[in-house]
Amino acid sequence: MDDELTLLPREKMLSFGITSLTDAELLALFLRTGTSGKSVFVLAQELLQHFGSLHGLLNANLDEFRYVEGIGLAKYAQLKGIAELARRYHSVRVLGDNPLLSPEMTKDFLQSQLSDAEREVFMVIFLDNQHRVVKHSRMFSGTLRHVEVHPREIVREAIKVNAAAVILAHNHPSGCAEPSKADKDITERIIKCCQFMDIHVLDHFIIGRGEYVSFAEQGWI
């Protein structure tokens, strides 16, 4: 264990595996260099402390970075690149022959797609009769507090891609995932619309900042 503590992140990863790295060490591995008078590891620690977590760091916008000493456009671009790489990884992972097996797996995917959105976005995952993803789409975009959703357009797209079921999702830019009455009402409208075409609504996820609510887990669907 003493040897592990004295190793640099890259050497530690090669010796003990990538999962042995702390968040700060993993971040330092990507940033590669520090700033004048500050090592990359110290920079990584300060970034995590400033933004509270990896999630907060990777979802921060350029204006928020302007207040962090030593972070220029190059470092900002690196961090946004990491976040986008993770988002695309999750996007590719759910397509193909692997079904969405659990709410946890679905939640991880949706957080990668929606948690950094600065306005409300309504997303739909279209699935076949074996719950394999045939398509996912950001169907509607709105304001900071509201997104207008059209159930018939969801049904039309589901028929177009021959989907047997859908999973609904939208984000709350405020960070609080608690559903509003409007969220519950639109879910009911979509369910009724889909029932006419024998399309099942499996769940509706609300994605906040580091939290989520699943309508299915709550027994609302």
From Swiss-Prot:
Zn(2+) binds at H170, H172, D183. PROSITE patterns: MPN, UPF0758. GO terms for molecular function: metal ion binding; metallopeptidase activity. Coiled coil: none annotated. InterPro entries: MPN, RadC_JAB, RuvA_2-like, UPF0758, UPF0758_CS, UPF0758_N, UPF0758_YicR. It comes from the Bacteria. Keywords: Hydrolase, Metal-binding, Metalloprotease, Protease, Zinc. Residues 99-221 form the MPN domain. SUPFAM superfamilies: RuvA domain 2-like. A motif (JAMM motif) lies at residues 170-183. One of its GO terms (biological process) is proteolysis. Belongs to the UPF0758 family. YicR subfamily. NCBIfam families: PRK00024.1, radc. This is UPF0758 protein Ent638_0101. It comes from Enterobacter sp. (strain 638).
